């Protein structure tokens, strides 16, 4: 199938979702050669990936991931018949690769939101193009990443947050690692990670590195069965909701997708220079994260509150972002958010 797919894509012919599923199955089962994989993902990038192609690829990655079971079973958001007895699971994640070198905003947000009673399955990896990925900062904070899937499940069930370390749960990705490194360009795999949470997160705040990805990835989430979510891109380049400029945001509901532009001032925050949100290496970012959770004020806290607010709306814990900001601020000021970090450190090191 992959030979036929390459021939179509080089002629700028889009694949159907079913065709993409067949190709990705071949890639992730080891049935395609490195040369075929490299040719295919390069041609796909040059053509431009469609919503159907991304959706098909995401379905295969989800199916082949090691599942993280939450509640009574695996919450699979590819299915139409989602078990309504399952608890809401939220992921706050970005594609990375935005080049802005901010501190780990979504990781900090995850602890704030989890301390508000939302089950959080934080999906992430080590840094690829940035100085510090979510796995790097968590490790520096003292979280043990070398844990079993059962420990991750226990963390989500017991304390309300677990870290899903992508390399440990997406073993079938090994077949694409070599070709991806050797061609050295962004491909479909750069955007698939945030779409393939192994815990089947049914609510999501997804940051993307390019404005043009906002609406397409929102439509992918909708096709995959996302109950409520936001796909965001700061117009300063951030794969987060930013304080420096406007943010382009697509809201995903069961009814469809709507896109708009927001400003920090709408939610009571002053804009700030980009330098106020920058981070550093893992140790430096760990100090920033802990400082925010301990109550440090300023633009870094504000950007966490704003992003957490949309996470709380996605998870149904706030009716709107304004209420979400108030709830998130109280979670930090009460010490609950910091306590959530300490609980995860303790549980993963037992």
Swiss-Prot record:
Keyword Iron: no
UniProt cofactor note: Binds 2 magnesium ions per monomer.
Catalytic reactions on record: N-(5-phospho-beta-D-ribosyl)anthranilate + diphosphate = 5-phospho-alpha-D-ribose 1-diphosphate + anthranilate
Annotated binding of anthranilate 1, by residue: 94, 125
An annotated Gene Ontology molecular function: anthranilate phosphoribosyltransferase activity
Binding site for 5-phospho-alpha-D-ribose 1-diphosphate: 94, 97-98, 102, 104-107, 122-130, 134
Pfam families named among the record's database cross-references: Glycos_trans_3N, Glycos_transf_3
Signal peptide residues on this chain, from the entry's feature table: none
GO biological process, one term: L-tryptophan biosynthetic process
Domain of life: Bacteria
Disulphides: none
Keywords of the record: Amino-acid biosynthesis, Aromatic amino acid biosynthesis, Glycosyltransferase, Magnesium, Metal-binding, Transferase, Tryptophan biosynthesis
Pathway assigned to this chain's UniProt record: Amino-acid biosynthesis; L-tryptophan biosynthesis; L-tryptophan from chorismate: step 2/5
Cofactors demanded by this protein: Mg(2+)
Binding locations of Mg(2+) 2: 239-240
A cellular-component GO term for this protein: cytosol
Chain residues that bind anthranilate 2: 180
Record flagged with keyword Transferase: yes
This enzyme's EC code(s): 2.4.2.18
Protein family according to the UniProt entry: Belongs to the anthranilate phosphoribosyltransferase family.
Assembly notes: Homodimer.
NCBIfam families the record matches: trpD
Its job: Catalyzes the transfer of the phosphoribosyl group of 5-phosphorylribose-1-pyrophosphate (PRPP) to anthranilate to yield N-(5'-phosphoribosyl)-anthranilate (PRA).
Protein name, entry field: Anthranilate phosphoribosyltransferase
Gene source species: Geobacter sulfurreducens (strain ATCC 51573 / DSM 12127 / PCA)
GN (gene name): trpD
């Amino acid at each position: 199938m992959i030979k036929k797919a390459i021939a179509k894509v080089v002629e700028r012919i889009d694949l159907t979702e079913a065709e993409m599923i067949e190709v990705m199955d071949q890639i992730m089962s080891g049935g395609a050669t490195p040369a075929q994989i490299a040719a295919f993902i390069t041609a796909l990038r040059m053509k431009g990936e469609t919503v159907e192609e991304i959706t098909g690829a995401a379905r295969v990655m989800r199916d082949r991931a090691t599942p993280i079971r939450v509640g009574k079973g695996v919450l699979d958001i590819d299915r139409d018949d989602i078990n309504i007895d399952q608890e809401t699971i939220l992921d706050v994640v970005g594609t990375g690769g935005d080049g802005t070198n901010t501190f780990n905003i979504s990781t900090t947000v995850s602890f704030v939101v989890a301390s508000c009673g939302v089950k959080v399955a934080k999906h992430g990896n080590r840094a690829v193009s940035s100085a510090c990925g979510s796995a790097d900062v968590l490790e520096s904070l003292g979280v043990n990443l070398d844990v079993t899937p059962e420990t991750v499940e226990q963390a989500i069930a017991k304390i309300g947050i677990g870290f899903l370390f992508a390399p440990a749960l997406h073993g079938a990705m090994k077949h694409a690692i070599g070709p991806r490194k050797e061609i050295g360009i962004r491909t479909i795999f750069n955007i698939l990670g945030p779409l393939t949470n192994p815990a089947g997160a049914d609510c999501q705040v997804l940051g993307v590195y390019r404005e043009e990805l906002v609406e397409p990835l929102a439509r992918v989430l909708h096709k995959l069965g996302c109950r409520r979510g936001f796909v965001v891109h700061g117009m300063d380049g951030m794969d987060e909701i930013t304080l420096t400029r406007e943010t382009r945001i697509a809201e995903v509901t069961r009814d469809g997708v709507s896109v708009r532009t927001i400003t920090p001032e709408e939610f009571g925050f002053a804009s700030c220079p980009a330098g106020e949100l920058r981070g550093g290496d893992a140790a430096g970012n760990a100090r920033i994260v802990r400082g925010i959770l301990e109550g440090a004020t300023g633009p870094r806290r504000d950007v966490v509150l704003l992003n957490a607010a949309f996470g709380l709306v996605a998870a149904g814990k706030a009716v709107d972002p304004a209420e979400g900001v108030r709830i998130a601020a109280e979670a930090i000021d009460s010490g609950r958010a910091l306590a959530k970090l300490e609980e995860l450190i303790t549980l993963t090191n037992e």
